[in-house]
Amino acid sequence: MRELRVISVSSAVLALLAIGLTAAPAAADTAATISIDGDGRSVTHLAGSGQVNELQVTPMGAGTGVRRVAFNDEVPIRAGEQHCVQPDPNDATRVVCELPTADASSGEIRILLGDGDDEFFTDAPGVSVVHGGSGNDQLHAHSAHTVIGGQDDDMLMGGVVMHGGDGMDHLMGDDRGQVLTGGRGADHIEAHGGADTVHAGFGDDHVTGGSGDDFLSGGFGDDTVHGDSGNDTLLGGPGKDVLSGGPDTDTILW
């Protein structure tokens, strides 16, 4: 029998899960802000209250000792005081930031989308956190490390760590080994390739492991869990569950 894997969630991620739940409402259509921390290595995008974002974060290559990242949206973005500019003064929806390092693995890019039914796209390296906030969000974040849906019904793609949050969420993994957590609500989780760890959470969930030696836990609710190929471990949890291992040598726990 395979040893169960226990995944801990850092206090930083738990704090991010609460973003948008306690903030006081502001006026609608406030511009988003892009700010860089004191050492110039970390960038935070904070959406304005009432905005519906269609944000794209795009790498623009590196210069001598710097790398450039572009933020493009359908709504206004306000550049911070240092290292970020609006290249076209007539276009308030585009900001370019320069980070004082040519190393894409150095520094962090944090995306906080807030309320609204937002869309997000990136293949830029160095995106550490994407948080959808409230609203039915679509987060295409293949290069990001941690992707959090937040409240409502979200679609998440990519991320080493994904958390759907509250609502009926759809989480889609890739060929890496990932940690996918559904949260509350009837979620649909597709792990795809890699040795994945899936915790479906509360609700009547549908989980598919894909290829790879996966650990799949249905959690609370009437869940359907299918291991697919690979030597998988399936755990049903409380509720009326349907568990199927698929090809290869699987372990099913009730």
Question: What positions do the PLM features span?
Answer:
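Consensus positions within tandem repeat domains that build extended binding/scaffold surfaces
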Residues: 117, 136, 153, 168, ...
